[in-house]
Swiss-Prot record:
Residues 1-92 are annotated as: Microtubule-binding region. One of its GO terms (biological process) is mitotic sister chromatid segregation. This is BUB3-interacting and GLEBS motif-containing protein ZNF207. The lineage of its organism: Eukaryota, Metazoa, Chordata, Craniata, Vertebrata. GO terms for cellular component: cytoplasm; kinetochore; microtubule; nucleus; spindle; spindle matrix.
Length: 452
């Protein structure tokens, strides 16, 4: 077998007996504490190097290593880190560390034994508490004066009810302990464990815990057969809530009327058809005063108009547009009729109406009794032709100058243009005035009074 290696010691300083985690840190410590020149503060590596530096540079002699413990101040001993330490000092260091390790182990073992003993001491009071509970179980239960002792619930020791804190009664005239209930207000286990108890219907599976069965008012325990007289007296003393509805209170005026109306519509029971179930008419409710009366009146008028239109769809509406005149608003709101479009209303204006001659009345001519010829000369109206109308021109004749000559037209000669202003009797004539120039030809220069 190979030789067993000795356990490597942790880095430590031989001069001051101090432990370090790393040998590099130990070397830095020795240079700063033990091998530093006290004159020029130069850091050297060994003790002999410090002595030589002081002798050659400062002409001084050093006989001891600074900051060293007594007995380890030899300046001639060359130690660098862990190297150069005497063997006897290394063995002594190992022996000291082993003793220290043994002492620490003994302390840990002693502390562990003490902790085990403390745990045993902690478990002792629990047994005494159980004994005390057992002794209290044999003690008779004490109730309030005038009330017999309460029977313990099945499955619970008799002394548990005496350990529970008493609660003062919530209703005057009713004791806080009743038959079938414990002092803390909890129902007895017997009533819950026996669903077919006489006088109480069986517990329903759909009811959550804490909800009384149907037929019992919340807050009243079930009546037992042992004390029927006491339970009936308690029930008779309970105040009956009044069924009469409270008087209607005045509704405060909201800051924003729309929000107040929304709240008024939302409040109240609602049926399956999303209609309020109360029979109070809406007209009896007092409407709050709106912040903006003009807009509110316009909304009310629009609503009333819509309701009247829906109720009477067969009647024709010829009413004028509704005009709102308010004292608080400066604007004037006009609401046109919804059944008539804006185009139809505009067509009814007088400027779009056509003046048709009545029977027995002479036609009205915008141009007077004379008409203007093609060259601007005045021409007398011919008999048998309708007068010219201003702003009207008829389309080209079907055969005109591009086809066969017109037949049956008075004053027309073949090969020539028909006189300007004439045409079929049923076609309105052209507008009088000078002819337009052809494309690409400049108009003639006329006098100062002419059109050009």
């Amino acid at each position: 077998m190979g030789r067993k290696k000795k356990k490597q010691l942790k880095p430590w300083c031989w001069y001051c007996n101090r432990d370090f985690d790393d040998e590099k840190i130990l070397i830095q410590h020795q240079k700063a504490k033990h091998f530093k020149c006290h004159i020029c503060h130069k850091k050297l590596y060994t003790g002999p190097g410090l002595a030589i530096h002081c002798m050659q540079v400062h002409k001084e002699t050093i006989d001891a290593v600074p900051n060293a413990i007594p007995g380890r101040t030899d300046i001639e001993l060359e130690i660098y880190g862990m190297e150069g330490i005497p063997e006897k000092d290394m063995e002594e260091r190992r022996r000291i560390l082993e003793q220290k390790t043994q002492v620490d182990g003994q302390k840990k073992k002693t502390n562990q034994d003490d902790s085990d003993y403390d745990d045993d001491d902690d478990t002792a009071p629990s047994t005494s508490f159980q004994q005390m509970q057992t002794q209290q179980a044999f003690m008779p239960t004490m109730g309030q004066p005038g009330i017999p002792g309460l029977p313990g619930a099945p499955g619970m020791p008799p002394g548990i009810t005496s350990l529970m804190p008493a609660v003062p009664p919530l209703i005057s005239g009713i004791p806080h302990v009743m038959a079938g209930m414990h002092p803390h207000g909890m129902m007895s286990m017997g009533g819950m464990m026996h669903p077919h108890r006489p006088g109480i219907p069986p517990m329903m599976a759909g009811l959550p815990p804490g909800v009384p069965p149907p037929g019992l008012r919340p807050g009243i325990p079930p009546v037992t057969q042992a004390q029927p007289a006491l339970s009936q007296a308690v029930v008779s003393r309970l105040p009956v809530p009044s069924t009469s509805a409270p008087a209607l209170q005045s509704v405060p005026k909201p800051l924003f009327p729309s929000a107040g109306q929304a709240q008024a519509h939302i409040s109240g029971p609602v049926g399956t058809d999303f209609k309020p179930l109360n029979n109070i008419p809406a007209t009896t409710a007092e409407h709050p005063k709106p912040t903006f009366p003009a807009y509110t009146q316009s909304t009310m008028s629009t609503t009333s108009t819509t309701n009247s239109t829906a109720s009477k769809p067969s009647t024709s509406i010829t009413s004028k547009p509704a005009t709102l005149t308010t004292t608080s608003a400066t604007s004037k709101l006009v609401h046109p009729d919804e059944d008539i479009s804006l185009e139809e209303k505009r067509a009814q204006l007088p400027k779009y109406q056509r003046n048709l001659p009545r029977p027995g009345q002479a036609p009205i001519s915008n141009m007077g009794s004379t008409a203007v010829g093609p060259l601007g000369a005045m021409m007398a109206p011919r008999p048998g032709l309708p007068p010219q109308q201003h702003g009207m021109r008829h389309p080209l004749p079907p055969h005109g100058q591009y086809g066969a000559p017109l037949q049956g037209m008075a004053g027309y000669h073949p090969g020539t243009m028909p006189p300007f202003g004439q045409g079929p009797p049923m076609v309105p004539p052209f507008q009088g005035g000078p002819p337009r120039p052809l494309m690409g030809i400049r108009p003639p220069v006329m006098s100062q009074g002419g059109r050009y």
